[in-house]
Amino acid sequence: MKYSILTLFPNIIKSYISESIIKKALEREKIELEIIDIRDFTTLPHNQVDEYQFGGGRGMVLMCDPVVSAIESVKTENSIVVLTSPQGKTWNQNLAKSFATEYNHIIIVCGHYEGFDERILKYIDVEISIGDYVLTGGELPSLIMLDSITRILPGVINTESHEQESFENNLLDYPVYTKPHDYRGDKVPEVLLSGHHANIQKWRDEQQLISTFNKRPDLIDESKLNKIQIQLLENLRKSKGDK
């Protein structure tokens, strides 16, 4: 997998990839990553890349030429060009999976200022949002995409870790505990200390469903439940009065 991140603030990206799982993926040559400074593609004095908007209004707008030139400098026939934008599709685990399996080169353009010149969208394949809130720029969304896609790629983390993570089956993760067994009277569930693997797995399956039902019920309909979870879901709905 190759990533090209187009940004006005390359040091933000460099700082993140010097740590964490991305650093390991780079060292193991599981991914390639290039950081493109959009300012390198302006022909204006003082590396200017933004201008006031036509028609008046607050905020500066990124101009077409530096952004489009930066895209064209790295784009190939097999690339997908992503713009981080509050107007885009909301990023989730299913999108991360599809990007990880369907594309070999992902170009991420980080948004900034009041926005982009609308004509830039002609050079964009998909707009992605990470939520309905305002950020200073697109660097954080780009890193979220980078991290969530990369950890899915073969050889980056082990298969068991994937299977146990939240959202892998559209369910939240089960509770986890470590030492001490008793912390201020709050004890670890005895089943986890029993050594009985079947009972432990049953408990974890149940807890996944209970957690999702209570915290993110919107995920339930998209999940693949086993027989125990289906029965438990029926009981949970009955106790809540759902039909």
From Swiss-Prot:
It catalyses: guanosine(37) in tRNA + S-adenosyl-L-methionine = N(1)-methylguanosine(37) in tRNA + S-adenosyl-L-homocysteine + H(+). This is tRNA (guanine-N(1)-)-methyltransferase. Its main location: cytoplasm. Belongs to the RNA methyltransferase TrmD family. Keywords: Cytoplasm, Methyltransferase, S-adenosyl-L-methionine, Transferase, tRNA processing. GO terms for biological process: tRNA N1-guanine methylation. SUPFAM superfamilies: alpha/beta knot. It is an enzyme of class 2 (transferase). GO terms for molecular function: tRNA (guanine(37)-N1)-methyltransferase activity. It is found in: Cytoplasm. The gene is trmD. Coiled coil: none annotated. The keyword Phosphoprotein does not apply.
